Design a protein with these regions (language model features):
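Hydrophobic helix-and-loop "lid/oligomerization" segment in the mid-to-C-terminal part
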Residues: 1-128
């Protein structure tokens, strides 16, 4: 248990990201995280993505972590949503329940809008 402990500051950052997450269609959670001043920001983003799946009704989570001119997307899901297919839309990949992608030269806000638009399009097409 001691090895998996985290600092209070990192815990607060994760808690805020979870608390501020936006829910789409009642089952997709999207959170953002500014990676400045955080040790291992992409790891923290992945932890938030995992934590969001603990919320009742959430089938997939997407955490966008902004670091300099890059946005890292950590995607997680319960078996019925294939996040690999979603992340492939951005040149990323992974596995059915764990995937990721990177977006370059895009703001955190714009990256979130792109993810939301992609989810909307894929839902309308019946892909998710």
């Amino acid at each position: 248990r001691k090895m998996s402990r985290t600092s209070m500051e990192t815990y607060k950052i994760r808690a805020k990201a979870v608390s501020d997450a936006e829910i789409m269609y009642g089952s997709f959670a999207i959170a953002t995280l500014v990676g400045i001043g955080i040790d291992s920001p992409t790891v923290v983003g992945a932890q938030v993505a995992n934590e969001l799946l603990d919320i009742d009704g959430i089938k997939a989570s997407f955490v966008l972590t902004g670091v300099e001119e890059r946005v890292y997307v950590s995607a997680r899901s319960i078996d019925e949503v294939n996040v690999q297919k979603i992340m492939e839309q951005f040149g990323g990949g992974g596995h059915l329940t764990v995937a990721g992608a990177q977006m370059v030269d895009v703001s955190l806000y714009d990256a979130k809008q792109i993810i939301k638009g992609t989810l909307q399009f894929m839902k309308e097409e019946g892909d998710i």
